[in-house]
Regions:
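Conserved N-terminal Rossmann-fold NAD(P) cofactor-binding segment
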Residues: 142-179
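Long, compositionally biased stretches enriched for glycine and/or charged residues
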Residues: 55-70, 281-407
Length: 407
């Protein structure tokens, strides 16, 4: 393993060609340590943390959600003590993102919110009241009057505890990516309340894919170093599409000069966790033991627990109730947007910026997979725990479907 010092990082690689220009020789390992690799950018992560050296070369998939077997040796002991990052040099902007994320702010953040419909407007209300880490929320919507209304009304809101609330400002198109977080809630083709469509979320894919692609390309052109937060449905599929479209030239050819996979995260699983807890309470189940994985919709997996007490029948019942909870609200004559806007968007976004565990769809191989993670300077750190064999089989099935989807 070759070691080099660069911009305050200790870089480690098997090949000289992986080091950036200006990297200097160093005699011994120090923190922060970053391992450099070159892997297929279509199917590999770009920047991620490891707590054990065995995680450096593990296959990308559901196994990344389970504990790794401890590695041995001096380098392994250093990684266990200090942690490390893994950076995929196949992405042309890899080193600039490494620098930007290591110097990221913890507060005084700027968030751009695109789309002031039902979900966007509700999420904005919560972020205004609860977003103490945010200095400014930039809002953008084709309906200029809607922007003016929210700017006017939300800057007339009093703080309940005396803390300064984030300022709400109208954003011009050229400033959309002058921010730390870009939250996309806009949507087209949402089925009406009288629609017989069973998968309301996937029905929106084609229209929303085209719309979000415009913003993915804008992020690329702006050399965006922040986080693209995909909130409109279908969250997991659109997250992958944002990553892919940002890394294509105008000809459609991939050059991987756009967003790193970890610069895109989907926010749809939070409400599924909340809905699962709602139904678990009715069934008298232990809420702390509940687990929720996978996409926001078809393919969702809810479990009464992840370990030895996993019950396939109870988990299947929880999954079905949770997956179709939106239809129950529609049957009452309402669009189900309150819980998603608050649980999936506002609460999950704020837990992310606070460095707390949260629900979201993160890159894993050739898909974005919903799970619990915590944001670090090296990207999302996935929660690892032992999985019951039957539960793991369910997760493998839904992961395979996400990978096989034609984005």
């Amino acid at each position: 393993m070759i070691l080099r010092r660069w911009k305050g990082f200790c870089l480690a690689a098997e090949e000289e060609a992986l080091f950036p220009r200006g990297a200097e020789m160093c005699g011994e390992v120090f923190a922060p340590l970053v391992f450099l690799v070159r892997r297929d950018p279509l199917r590999a992560r770009g920047l991620y943390p490891i707590r054990d050296l065995s995680e450096l070369d593990e296959p990308e998939g559901i196994g990344c959600l389970t504990p790794s077997s401890p590695a041995e040796g001096e380098m392994a002991a250093f990684v266990r003590a200090h942690g490390a990052g893994v950076l995929n040099a196949a992405f042309s902007r890899a080193f600039s993102i490494l620098q930007a994320w290591s110097a990221a702010k913890k507060d005084g953040l700027v968030l751009t919110l695109v789309g002031l419909g039902d979900v966007g407007g509700t999420a904005l209300l919560a972020l205004k009241l609860l977003g103490r880490e945010l200095a400014k929320i930039q809002i953008f919507d084709p309906n200029r009057a809607q922007c003016q209304r929210y700017e006017m009304e939300l800057n007339q809101v009093l703080s309940a505890d005396g803390r300064t609330l984030p300022e709400v400002v109208i954003c011009e198109e050229q400033d959309l990516f002058r921010c730390d977080l870009f939250a996309f809630t806009a949507s087209r083709g949402v089925p009406g309340l009288d629609s017989k469509v069973q998968d309301v979320r996937m029905a929106q894919y084609e229209a929303n894919r085209a719309m979000v692609g415009t913003y993915a390309r804008m992020a690329r052109q702006a050399d965006f170093t922040g986080l693209f937060c995909q909130i409109s449905d279908p969250v997991d599929h659109l997250s992958r599409s944002v990553f892919l479209q940002s890394n294509q030239k105008e000809t459609g050819e991939f050059d991987f000069a756009g967003l790193l996979p970890e610069q895109v995260q989907g926010f749809g699983l939070g409400v599924m966790a909340a809905r699962c807890a709602y139904y678990a309470r009715q069934l008298g189940l232990d809420e702390d033991a509940l687990r929720v994985y996978g996409p926001h919709g078809q393919g969702l997996v809810c479990a009464n627990c992840c370990g030895g007490n996993y019950d396939a029948a109870i988990s299947a019942e929880l999954t079905e109730k949770t997956r179709t909870a939106n239809l129950r609200v529609r049957e009452l004559g309402f669009k189900p947007y309150l819980a998603p806007a608050l649980s999936s968007a506002a609460a999950s976004l704020l837990r992310l910026v606070r460095g707390q565990e949260h629900y979201g769809a993160v890159p894993l191989g050739g898909a974005y997979f919903g799970c619990v993670s915590r944001m670090t300077r090296f990207g999302p750190e996935l929660r690892r725990e032992a999985l019951a064999p039957a539960l793991r089989a369910e997760l493998e099935k839904t992961y395979a479907a996400l990978e096989a989807f034609e984005y």
